[in-house]
Amino acid sequence: PYMYWIAGQVKKRNMPMELVLLPIVESAFDPHATSGANAAGIWQIIPSTGRNYGLKQTRSYDARRDVVASTTAALDMMQRLNKMFDGDWLLTVAAYNSGEGRVLKAMKANKARGKSTDFWSLSLPQETKIYVPKMLALSDILKNSKRYGVQLPTPDESRALARVRLSNPVDIQQVADMTGMSVSKLKTFNAGVKGSTLGASGPQYVMVPQKHAEQLRESLASG
């Protein structure tokens, strides 16, 4: 369900659709994922980077795990990096993974030796050397699934996430009752919220699959 949301945001910004696949490489689309370096959420954002991009991190809410907020931050970051690397998306993705400092240093070293400064020519950490090809390989498999003998699930728009505005804080159990969804599913779709109250210290919205959105809006409006 996250992929639909991210694809919509990437499309709005006219960015390459391959970027939608990065959370697969980063976290397998797990908003609860946390790395050894304390990177969190589907985009695996570290605390300091999160703060630099306005991602609130408190005892009751971590925007790095919020699909909406973290996607906005990740795409903002990549747009900034892309300008820095003159529109080269492979260098942009490499810098997203290892930091722009490392990529710039590797480019400077290659320039000094009279070597090319494209992604494939740079001396980068092993993780980054694998990271970019993984994204490209996933993209190739999706585009040529029949050739690879891969059966892809049929896209189901009703599973896409929708944002439902909250005028007041609401208990997650109440939203579960209104939608017929489980609390655990709601917590996964709204992973930034650490407690059981939505719309309190976190964002003034709740994310639910499209098929439940209208029903929830009506239930909330009727009190």
Language-model segment annotations:
Residues 16-24, 40, 88-94:
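Alpha-helical scaffolds flanking conserved acidic
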Residues 1-2, 8, 12-13, 52, ...:
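Extracytoplasmic and endomembrane cell-envelope/extracellular-matrix remodeling and assembly machinery
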Residues 33-54:
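Short, surface-exposed glycine/acidic/tryptophan-bearing loops
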